[in-house]
């Protein structure tokens, strides 16, 4: 029986060849291929800079850290997401503020968002679930309305002057809203390049950010480099330059840089990505047609306002309980079709 895996990586001989060349080059950690991929993604998203890291989780956490968020602060996110959206808030010592979804929606309840913003609120992490951009215009409307409560703690917060939008766009690389790419809509954006994602580097992620008046992009990029490489003032590539061995440790930070082996996969994936997105759209169209007469609710991936990356095809079985859903998943598995549940709401977990 033919089986259909849930989300296998789409790897061709071209990716394998590029990885082999990286291995033969003698440079396998952060280096020229990582820098090349960063430039490709920045051009694609329409941003000045991109920092490639080893995961979206690292990206989410470093976004909060460059903003100086920590103990005594509050960060808002959705209750309907993967744990990383919230766990990074705990990592930095801030308080997690969860908002439930609106009725009949997978997005957070924006009416509740307005009510939970306090003087301690420093950021919101909205989630582009399944590759569909969330309602950014509504989010900006609300945080601008409540900006009088905002008390900045560092120069970036002060320059922005309101609650900062740090999008969890782990699913949404390649998505657009009102003609603008995800990655250049929120103040800061995190992408995932994990093995199950549309665009993969096996493991990996990236941070992007919009231009901020009064903030130097090169300085901000360097801050990410420090945070992702033990606070070391120069990466390994920079230290190979003539007479440039000496470096400084600027802080006791972290180790979450992307390697050139990972970037090698991404460089080829990037060339193939338009076709990969086109293929996903064709499959989603088939699903939409096949389920049109069924008693289910599905997300709309393509509208006049947005274009999804098509990462997940979520189906809500109407008027059915979890026992029916679980039996349905089993029946699909018996037919060789893998499915999954995205997501168990965070408050339903043991911790």
Where are these predicted regions, by residue range?
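N-terminal "arm"/small-domain region of PLP-dependent enzymes with the aminotransferase-like
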Residues: 1-28, 32, 248-250
């Amino acid at each position: 029986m033919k089986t259909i895996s849930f989300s296998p990586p789409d790897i061709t001989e071209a990716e394998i060849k590029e990885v082999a060349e990286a291995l033969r080059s003698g440079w396998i950690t952060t280096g020229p291929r990582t820098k090349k991929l960063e430039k490709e993604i920045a051009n694609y998203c329409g941003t000045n800079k991109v920092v490639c890291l080893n995961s979206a989780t690292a990206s989410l956490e470093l976004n909060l850290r460059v903003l100086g968020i920590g103990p005594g602060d509050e960060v808002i996110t959705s209750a309907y997401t993967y744990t990383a959206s919230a766990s990074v808030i705990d990592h930095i010592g801030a308080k997690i503020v969860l908002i439930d979804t609106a009725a009949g929606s997978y997005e957070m309840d924006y009416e509740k968002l307005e009510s939970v913003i306090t003087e301690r609120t420093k950021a919101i992490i909205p989630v582009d679930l399944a590759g569909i951009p969330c309602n950014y215009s509504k989010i900006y409307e609300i945080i601008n309305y409540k900006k009088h409560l905002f008390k900045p703690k560092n120069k970036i917060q002060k320059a922005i002057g309101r609650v900062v939008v740090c999008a969890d766009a782990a699913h949404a690389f390649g998505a657009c809203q009102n003609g603008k790419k995800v990655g250049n809509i929120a103040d800061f954006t995190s992408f995932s390049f994990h093995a199950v994602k549309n665009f993969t580097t096996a493991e990996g992620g990236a941070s992007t950010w919009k231009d901020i008046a009064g903030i130097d992009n090169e300085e901000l990029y360097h801050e990410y480099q420090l945070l992702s490489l033990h606070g070391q003032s120069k990466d390994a590539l920079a230290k190979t330059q003539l007479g440039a061995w000496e470096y400084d440790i600027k802080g006791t930070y972290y180790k979450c840089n992307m390697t050139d082996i990972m970037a090698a996969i991404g460089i080829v994936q990037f060339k193939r990505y338009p076709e990969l997105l086109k293929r996903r759209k064709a499959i989603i169209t088939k699903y939409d047609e096949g389920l049109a007469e069924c008693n289910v609710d599905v997300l709309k991936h393509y509208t006049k306002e947005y274009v999804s990356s098509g990462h997940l095809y979520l189906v809500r079985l109407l008027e059915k309980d979890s026992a029916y859903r679980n039996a349905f998943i089993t029946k699909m598995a018996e037919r060789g079709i893998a499915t999954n549940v995205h997501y168990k709401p965070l408050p339903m977990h043991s911790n």
